[in-house]
């Protein structure tokens, strides 16, 4: 049965060592694996890092640039060379590819988000393998994915993938970094991310040439599994592992997808949008939303954090400040401060106009517990 596969390869797997040289043998093997999957009927997306690393190599830089403008310039140099390499390798196997460069703003804007979806579908119909990367040259700090693990998870959610493979420089997730801690225990299967968080130690940074560590991969797994995508962390230096895993072998760390998934629009609200503020709720409102599936009313709001406009995304928090949901607000932050704790029947009198009865309607609300 044909499946949709999203494969993310990081800079640590693309590079052959600390000097940042490309691991061409590994990349060529990955290309062969992806072409094999494509030819048997699977739909394949490759999310590839490496523009900054390749650009730095071409420019003779010995360290990854730190300033945004310099990173963007180096990425502009590297992205073309990266795609040329992929095009040369895929062309040997007569497999057409496409470059898709996106920014976080493309995922935040609903129309742009849908346009990206339609582009993927058209490429799949044409038998093309899309190669995705963040458009580093035009991205701004406030609207960056930050790492391609997150980008790959959002892409997997967007195209409703069956599998997300996060290729890294270790064979699976461990209780601690096995390169440092010899007592680290391998983790083969994850059902509860909450339980996992209590048992492992993860770093916030990856290799010198990458931006993502294991923590970002776990966050990516959360996004993907919430969308019903089985996620696997495995060794990027052995691309044939993908075929073995698809064949049923127990390699890597498998994150089980959630059995009940939300619809595509709510996935967009929950994970693609960037919350502009927070609404703190009383216990009654928390229960009504998480158990009863109700809309958020003004009466249940105890605190408003941040400045935002109507239809912006916000976090909904319990009395301790822990996030319980996300949603699109019907009023701006100033208006909500004026009506918080009030009955819905009083909103028009307080605001001076008749608006929505709800602060966040349940159709625009997603529980994230």
From Swiss-Prot:
Keyword Cytoplasm included in the entry's annotation: yes
Positions annotated to bind substrate: 49, 136, 148
One GO CC term, this protein: cytosol
SMART domains linked: PUA
Keyword tRNA processing attributed: no
InterPro entries xrefs: AceGlu_kinase-like_sf, Asp/Glu/Uridylate_kinase, G5K_ProB, Glu/AcGlu_kinase, Glu_5kinase, Glu_5kinase/COase_Synthase, Glutamate_5-kinase_CS, PUA
Keywords per UniProt: Amino-acid biosynthesis, ATP-binding, Cytoplasm, Kinase, Nucleotide-binding, Proline biosynthesis, Transferase
Principal location listed in the UniProt entry: cytoplasm
Domain PUA: 276-354
Example of a GO biological process term: L-proline biosynthetic process
Record's subcellular location: Cytoplasm
Pathway: Amino-acid biosynthesis; L-proline biosynthesis; L-glutamate 5-semialdehyde from L-glutamate: step 1/2
Enzyme class: transferase
Catalyses which reaction(s): L-glutamate + ATP = L-glutamyl 5-phosphate + ADP
PROSITE patterns xrefs: GLUTAMATE_5_KINASE, PUA
GO molecular function: ATP binding; glutamate 5-kinase activity; RNA binding
EC number: 2.7.2.11
Entry binding sites for ATP: 8, 168-169, 211-217
Family that this chain belongs to: Belongs to the glutamate 5-kinase family.
HAMAP family for the chain: ProB
General function of this protein: Catalyzes the transfer of a phosphate group to glutamate to form L-glutamate 5-phosphate.
Protein name as it appears in the record: Glutamate 5-kinase
Provenance organism: Thermosynechococcus vestitus (strain NIES-2133 / IAM M-273 / BP-1)
Gene assigned in the entry: proB
């Amino acid at each position: 049965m044909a499946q949709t596969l999203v494969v993310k390869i990081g800079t640590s797997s693309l590079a052959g060592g600390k000097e940042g040289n490309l691991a061409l043998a590994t990349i060529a093997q990955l290309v062969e694996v992806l072409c094999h999957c494509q030819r048997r009927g699977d739909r394949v997306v490759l999310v590839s890092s490496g523009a900054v690393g390749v650009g730095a190599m071409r420019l003779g830089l010995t360290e990854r640039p730190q300033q945004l403008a310099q990173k963007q310039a180096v990425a502009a140099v590297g992205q073309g060379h990266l795609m040329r390499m992929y095009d040369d390798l895929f062309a040997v196997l007569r497999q057409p590819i496409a470059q898709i460069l996106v920014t976080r703003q493309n995922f935040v804007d609903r129309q742009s988000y849908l346009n990206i979806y339609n582009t993927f579908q058209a490429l799949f119909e044409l038998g093309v393998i899309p190669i995705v990367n963040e458009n580093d040259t035009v991205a701004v700090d406030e609207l960056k994915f930050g790492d391609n693990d997150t980008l790959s998870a959002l892409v997997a959610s967007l195209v409703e993938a069956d599998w997300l493979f996060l290729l890294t420089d270790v064979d699976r997730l461990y209780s601690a970094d096995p390169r440092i801690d010899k007592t680290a225990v391998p983790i083969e299967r994850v059902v509860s991310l909450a339980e996992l968080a209590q048992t492992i130690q993860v770093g916030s940074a990856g290799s010198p040439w990458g931006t993502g560590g294991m923590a970002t991969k776990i966050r990516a797994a959360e996004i993907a599994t919430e969308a019903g995508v089985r996620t696997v962390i495995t060794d990027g230096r052995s691309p044939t592992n993908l075929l073995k895993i698809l064949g049923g072998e127990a390699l890597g760390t498998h994150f089980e997808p959630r059995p009940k998934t939300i619809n595509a629009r709510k996935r967009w609200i929950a994970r693609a949008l960037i919350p502009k503020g927070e609404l703190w709720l009383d216990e009654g409102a928390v229960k009504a939303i998480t158990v009863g599936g109700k809309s958020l009313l003004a009466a249940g709001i105890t605190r408003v954090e941040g400045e935002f406009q109507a239809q912006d995304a916000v976090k909904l928090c319990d009395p301790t400040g822990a996030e319980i949901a996300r949603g699109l607000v019907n009023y701006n932050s100033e208006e909500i401060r004026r009506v918080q704790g009030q009955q819905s029947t009083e909103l028009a009198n307080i605001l001076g106009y008749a608006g929505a009865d709800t602060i966040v309607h349940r159709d625009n609300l997603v529980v994230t517990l």
